[in-house]
Amino acid sequence: MAITYLKKSPKTSSTDDTKTTGIVQDLLKDIEKTKEQGCIELTKKFDKYDGEIVVSKERIEEIKKTLDQKTKDDIQFSYDRVRKFAEAQLKNYGQNFEVELSEGLYAGQKLVPVNTAGCYIPGGRYAHIASAVMSVTTAKVAGVKNIIACSPPKEGVGAHPTIVYTADLCGADVILNLGGVPAIAAMTNGLFKNPPADIIVGPGNQFVAEAKRILFGKVGIDLFAGPTEIGIIADAKADPEIVAVDLVGQAEHGYNSPCWLYTTSKELAEKVMKRVPELIAELPEVPRTNADAAWRDYGEVILCDTDEEMVKISDEYAPEHLEVQTENLKWFHERLTNYGSLFVGEETTVAYGDKCSGTNHILPTKGAGRYTGGLFVGKFIKTLSFQRMTKESTELVGAAAARISRYEGMEAHARTGDVRLKKYGYSCLLYTSPSPRD
């Protein structure tokens, strides 16, 4: 058994860029000192935008009136499905409970939404309407009270009108004309009269990703996101045209977007490798430039001897998006374990999940699918534990806790049990016994 690379990536997609880190650290330090004015000046510098940062209610109403109905209908279509899926997640995401662990000792958990979420919505190369739906809707369904949305402004316009419309529809309380590092810093530090975000979610470029990484700890984040990825598992029964189109569909995201094909059919692989450059050549300039570089530098075609090998290599790569176009779909679905989101069968495709089918498109990259999933209602919800006790239950629990503490050499811990045992009329070693380890 062996695998053969018919096309091997000459580069390794990486977000470990010391130059990016230095730039982002300097910008964050500047904003920490200059606050809102720093965000305003950097927005003028980077986005050539010098209008209001906070999108006004009047601007939102203006967009509602001027945006064409078909666009609004399509956004509503996406919103309805993403909301329905998020509601299903919430319904099945654990429960508040309390249980009696022993007589008089009760413990439980309580699910509590974070107070404030910051949602970053990219708007550089493309107007990512769907990212507004994915982040804001999921936070709203989770029960977050304050939702701040940020998206890069365009000169003289502000954030893209469809992004503003979508963020408002999905439940954003405030929308800011901010992008990049200033946006992440503003949401983290509670600028422009907003509370500081407890968590920041949403995709972005390397500067957004690095700002989130640096600020993680001060603020929660959804995940460390790298360039978007696609993996496709395909056998001899797959349609090479559809496989090729789907690879190109993700490659257009950016010059460093990996696209991988795992197949047991050399004939299919060769057809796909021939067709991909042809499809790229037919694209408009911006997506063509992105896709050409992505396929050239980060595209791989891996020939496997068996279905088991395809599962193994796919799980090693743990792609953000994974399509399965094979004869035995159920067999693969049951065995694959590492991916961000799975698209089972030719009938579905990554673009459906990216835009409107309901599952979230904010997903783990760079192999993180080995240990985490994508954005879901649970990212906005804290699972908090609690306990309460009767005085009678202290006799057993207090004594055991005191003994364990002394075994560990933690006398002050032990005495917190002793003082209660003494108060409630039970025997104890209050303040008298050194640790048995001494």
Please tell me what each predicted stretch does.
Residues 1-115:
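N-terminal Rossmann-like NAD(P)+-binding subdomain of aldehyde/semialdehyde dehydrogenases
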Residues 431-438:
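Conserved small/polar residues in nucleotide/adenosyl-binding loops
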Residues 99-165:
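Conserved small-residue-rich beta-alpha loop and adjacent elements
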Residues 315-427:
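C-terminal core of ALDH-fold dehydrogenases
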Residues 175-179, 301-306:
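Short acidic-hydrophobic, aromatic-tinged amphipathic segments that line or gate anion-handling sites
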Residues 203, 223-234, 250-273, 291-302, ...:
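Short loop-to-beta-strand entry elements in the cores of soluble alpha/beta enzymes
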Residues 169-249, 253-258:
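Conserved NAD(P)+-binding/catalytic subdomain of aldehyde/semialdehyde dehydrogenases
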